[in-house]
Swiss-Prot record:
Heme b b566 binds at H97, H196. It is found in: Mitochondrion inner membrane. One of its GO terms (molecular function) is metal ion binding. This is Cytochrome b. PANTHER family: CYTOCHROME B. SUPFAM superfamilies: a domain/subunit of cytochrome bc1 complex (Ubiquinol-cytochrome c reductase), Transmembrane di-heme cytochromes. Keywords: Electron transport, Heme, Iron, Membrane, Metal-binding, Mitochondrion, Mitochondrion inner membrane, Respiratory chain, Transmembrane, Transmembrane helix, Transport, Ubiquinone. The lineage of its organism: Eukaryota, Metazoa, Chordata, Craniata, Vertebrata. Belongs to the cytochrome b family. The cytochrome bc1 complex contains 3 respiratory subunits (MT-CYB, CYC1 and UQCRFS1), 2 core proteins (UQCRC1 and UQCRC2) and probably 6 low-molecular weight proteins. It is a multi-pass membrane protein. The chain crosses the membrane at residues 33-53, 77-98, 113-133, 178-198, 226-246, 288-308, 320-340, 347-367. It comes from Dactyloptena peterseni (Starry flying gurnard). GO terms for biological process: mitochondrial electron transport, ubiquinol to cytochrome c.
Length: 380
């Protein structure tokens, strides 16, 4: 008799994705982040569902409903802290996952990569609308500032902003629809994740050498299922440690003050994981230019496969591009720092240089270095 997991219509799909999947024998811990992102998504949906049971999306009660969750609901404080800090870990994993893709040339699986970029945009949208829900000062003003950027769209800008607001300012209608979006989007993300995996399993995983690994495959289970389990344990220990010992470390103190349209906080800034993009937005004096730069700071990832010039796939044996990659990492860290600083000298010029370098690395230096390394190989 054949094994049920190989014949059952539903089980064989799971089997082909999680048990009998042939995986390269040499994939490192950098290949763990995909499954960790899956774990993050499941954790966020689970904690979010329990929060939604007690949350009210009305400006009169939203702030106090969050306080009520933390004070009166059984383990509500824990669920809320896990959900808020889970978002941070989600983005840590996303950025490491993207960094791995850039380093090892995984972006040459174009469909998988492009679905991944769409996933990043969806997660960013979800995090943004979610941050508005507690209706604190930074929630309100963050929503006001970011939605206002759409007014830079020529001709239809103002109508667009009022349409999204549901009125002439960020108000009750805005909060209600943001809650609806925040509830809906994670399920769209889950669906897009399935598509992401579907495309990945058409080609199989890349590996640290960037060479074809068909001759050296091992089954996903038990080898990588247990390796993933170790990653799960590390992530969950880190998340619970942060949520239990220092839950407000990454939050903004301004969000402990209920939203007040009459008082603007001294420094309006998003959560840490958006600061690099916020710095790029602010570094351009023109409103429309800033909005386009903000959009392109993420969409530039879609150009990476097109701009790949090297004959080799990964950066494992490419010292020049390796240097550029780590320059990019340092640049994003600098942008993150600048995004959290006030708009004054010397932060303005540092932000502008870092923003220019960000795009210059992606669009000019990396393709050039790839071409140069090809030439060096021809000469040697």
């Amino acid at each position: 008799m054949t094994n049920l997991r190989k014949t059952h219509p539903l089980l064989k799909i799971a089997n082909d994705a999680l048990v009998d999947l042939p995986a390269p024998a040499n994939i490192s811990v950098w290949w763990n982040f995909g499954s960790l992102l899956g774990l993050c998504l499941i954790t966020q949906i689970a904690t979010g569902l329990f929060l939604a049971m007690h949350y009210t999306s009305d400006i009169a009660t939203a702030f106090s409903s969050v306080a009520h969750i933390c004070r009166d609901v059984n383990y509500g404080w824990l669920i809320r802290n896990l959900h808020a800090n889970g978002a941070s870990f989600f983005f840590i994993c996303i950025y490491l996952h993207i960094g791995r893709g850039l380093y090892y040339g995984s972006y040459l699986y174009k469909e998988t990569w492009n679905v991944g970029v769409i996933l990043l945009l969806l997660v960013m949208m979800t995090a943004f609308v979610g941050y508005v829900l507690p209706w604190g000062q930074m929630s309100f003003w963050g929503a006001t500032v970011i939605t206002n950027l759409l007014s830079a769209v020529p001709y239809v800008g103002n109508s667009l902003v009022q349409w999204i607001w549901g009125g002439f300012s960020v108000d009750n209608a805005t909060l209600t629809r943001f809650f609806a979006f925040h509830f809906l989007l994670p399920f769209i993300i889950a669906a897009a994740t399935v598509i992401h995996l579907l495309f990945l399993h058409e080609t199989g995983s890349n590996n640290p050498t960037g060479l074809n690994s068909d001759a050296d495959k091992i089954s996903f289970h038990p080898y990588f299922s247990y390796k993933d389990l170790l990653g799960f344990a590390a992530l969950l220990i880190a998340l619970t440690s942060l949520a239990l010992f220092s839950p407000n470390l990454l939050g903004d103190p301004d969000n402990f003050t209920p939203a007040n349209p009459l008082v603007t906080p001294p420094h309006i800034k998003p959560e840490w994981y958006f600061l690099f993009a916020y710095a790029i937005l602010r570094s351009i004096p023109n409103k429309l230019g800033g909005v386009l730069a903000l959009l392109f700071s993420i969409l530039v990832l879609m150009l990476v496969p097109i701009l790949h010039t090297s004959k080799q796939r990964g950066l494992t044996f490419r010292p020049i591009t390796q240097f550029l990659f780590w320059t990019l990492v340092a640049d994003v860290i600098i942008l993150t720092w600048i995004g959290g600083m006030p708009v004054e000298h010397p932060f303005i010029i540092i932000g502008q240089i870092a923003s220019f370098l960000y795009f210059f690395l992606f669009l000019v230096l990396t393709p050039l270095a790839g071409w140069l390394e090809n030439k060096a190989l021809e000469w040697s």
